[in-house]
């Protein structure tokens, strides 16, 4: 094989890139890309119209919080507690993930009250969110297509049950680009119970889009991103020689193959180089004023949902387009009383503080905050010995949104008297996605990518903007 043949060039360059990545960690190839290629806008003509929101923080309660215990009180469940579920509720649909037989109805043991001028009804498990009730747009009529965790999380993120499609954050990065060349457009933070539902890389993947649009996970302790520091023994002169060589090889390889994934790899190196300067200071939340730390309940030294909420605000202040916080531990099949109390105690105050903090900084107006999981939980009990929980429930659940041009203080949609089915203004996940994109200035039918002979989009061939919840 001649050294100048295309296949030999590809192998040679890929091997060199692999050795460089291993030897230099994620040291960037700063000379290969112009800075504006990373901070540039997205597709021509996007946004399609003036956006109400410029950025999104998605507080994802992984596992599925119980709507009938948090936002959707059902006196009928309390009245009929212990009675078998009416058979007519179970007709013509997928029923339960794990429950077998005919289960009994289970009323919520928690008290609900009206809060704020809006009178939004919230459970006693969420006393801090109750104080910001007038900021919330509560959707009680969400529904999705599956009661299985991984496909349901994929569906909430990708608009499909499959794990090989772009996520919401990736679509936004693709359509709108990045506002900051020093940070990724899409960042993922995780917290919660270590024995919670596993988090898959597909939940923040790029699918068939360019790999630079994938979410970048930040660690919740220590260095947020590994391998940003130069390894011992690598001098500036050493790095300069390697970068010069890769630049030369990049030009040759582009001439021969024009492989777009090579450009993505180089862009990642460029971004990593810039992150060496931007990330360390960004992650130092101990620099936050004491009253802000107290407001969020955050200990700078401990990984937590509270710490991630603070970090999310710092990220969007610096132009990150989409920040997604996964909080694990909401999958309460047994001992739901203990588990939901634990999860609410960890997530309630930080979520409320995030809204208050964004508002007092003037950021809530154009930042869309989303709270919810992949589905809800059953109005019937899943009994295990002396404890009980609730199974997965895709037919009806609650999510809330705040800021970003939403109508504050509104409770939208309704479920039946058992909280089992949606009966008023149902909102499918595709509708939610269409609405989110609309607030970001995007017509969801125009944000497409052509592959495999057809145009794909986040909302597939469905989805309607829920205009009634918009301010």
Predicted feature descriptions by range:
Residues 1-471:
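Ligand-binding pockets and gating/stacking loops
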């Amino acid at each position: 094989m001649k050294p100048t043949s295309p296949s030999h060039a590809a192998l040679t360059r890929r091997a060199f890139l692999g050795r460089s990545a291993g030897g230099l960690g994620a040291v960037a190839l700063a000379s290969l890309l112009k800075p504006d290629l990373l901070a540039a806008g997205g597709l021509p003509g996007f946004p399609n119209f003036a956006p109400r929101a410029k950025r999104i923080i998605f507080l994802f309660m992984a596992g599925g919080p119980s709507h009938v215990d948090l936002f959707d009180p059902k006196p009928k469940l309390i009245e009929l507690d212990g009675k078998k579920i009416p058979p007519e509720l179970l007709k013509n649909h997928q029923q339960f993930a794990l429950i077998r037989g005919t289960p009994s109805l289970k009323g919520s043991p928690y008290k609900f009250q009206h809060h704020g001028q809006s009178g939004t009804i919230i459970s006693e498990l969420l006393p801090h969110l109750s104080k910001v009730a007038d900021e919330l747009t509560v959707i009680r009529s969400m529904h999705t297509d599956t009661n299985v965790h991984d496909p349901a999380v994929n569906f909430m993120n990708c608009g499909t049950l499959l794990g090989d499609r772009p996520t919401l954050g990736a679509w936004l990065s693709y359509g709108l680009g990045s506002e900051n060349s020093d940070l990724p457009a899409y960042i993922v933070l995780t917290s919660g119970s270590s024995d919670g539902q596993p988090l898959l890389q597909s939940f923040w993947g790029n699918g068939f889009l360019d790999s630079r649009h994938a979410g970048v996970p930040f660690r919740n302790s220590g260095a947020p991103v590994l391998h940003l520091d130069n390894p011992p023994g690598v001098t500036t002169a050493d790095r300069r020689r390697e970068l010069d060589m890769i630049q030369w090889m990049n030009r040759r390889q582009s001439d021969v193959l024009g492989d777009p994934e090579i450009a993505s790899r180089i862009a990642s190196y460029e971004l990593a180089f810039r992150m060496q300067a931007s990330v360390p200071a960004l992650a130092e939340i101990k620099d936050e004023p004491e009253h802000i730390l107290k407001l969020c309940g955050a200990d700078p030294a401990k990984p937590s949902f509270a710490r991630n909420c603070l970090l999310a605000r710092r990220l969007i202040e610096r132009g990150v387009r989409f920040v997604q916080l996964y909080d694990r531990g909401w999958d309460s099949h047994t001992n739901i009383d203990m588990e939901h109390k634990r999860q609410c105690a960890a997530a309630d105050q930080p979520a409320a503080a995030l809204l208050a903090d964004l508002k007092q900084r003037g950021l809530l107006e154009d930042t869309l905050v989303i709270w919810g999981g992949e589905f809800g939980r059953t109005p019937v009990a899943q009994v295990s010995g002396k404890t009980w929980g609730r199974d997965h429930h895709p037919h009806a659940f609650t999510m809330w949104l705040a800021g970003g041009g939403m109508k504050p203080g509104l409770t939208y949609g309704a479920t039946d008297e058992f909280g089992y089915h949606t009966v008023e203004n149902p909102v499918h996940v595709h509708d939610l996605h269409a609405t989110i994109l609309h607030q970001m200035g995007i017509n969801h039918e125009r944000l497409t990518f052509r592959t495999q002979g057809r145009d794909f989009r986040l909302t597939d061939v469905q989805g309607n903007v829920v205009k009634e919840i918009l301010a």
